[in-house]
């Protein structure tokens, strides 16, 4: 990581400067959205990245924080994994990282990205215990120059572990998007994630069913590879919203490898589904808070 060190004055802080910085920064984030899943392999990060890009495509200012310390891939999926991360030094001695941005050649409002994937070599594991992971996440929240955002998207690792607790205890989430697939084993773990967010009193909790179906490229028929309707039934059972289905898209792998969100391939079924998802989310948050979600 390359460091540049202009000195910036900061106001007096309390007994826990990092916690205070988080609280000050949070005031500039209109909506804080968690994206999580009960288990791995459901395409959670794909949903987080494409929701981010869809919101930016709609003209919103969006930041995405990759809270998966041990398996970060958001930066690669957004094509900024090779970007250098710079930092500014403040007069109290702490540094704040400057998040790389991407606008995909003007196709979207610039997206701010921060991930451990930009700070460690691709093949180097992060072998940290819980306390170090907790500190790292707090630093990604409080020691990054996020600035004013319409949406802060936080991509969590699979499961219901320390990372989620750390964020929920540090900032007030406005919504949690739980990603699942139609498979029964995924739905079982999804229910746990939904109930965790409800217990944490997150104001809005919703389910998204990813890899919901495939449109055959030859005949155009819909194929339910992993079953049908499981995500919607789970949402009904748990009493939360169902935001929609994201189809399997053959272009998604190519797009991900290139560091381009599939939502920018406008004519694909997945792109259309992600835009609908983003619009539904904005409308729901507008309904809850009584405004359009945009500064």
Swiss-Prot record:
UniProt entry tagged with the keyword Amino-acid biosynthesis: no
One annotated GO biological process: iron-sulfur cluster assembly
SUPFAM superfamilies: P-loop containing nucleoside triphosphate hydrolases
Pfam family, one: ParA
SS bond partners: none
Subunit and partners: Homodimer.
HAMAP family: Mrp_NBP35
Record's protein name: Iron-sulfur cluster carrier protein
Gene source species: Pyrococcus horikoshii (strain ATCC 700860 / DSM 12428 / JCM 9974 / NBRC 100139 / OT-3)
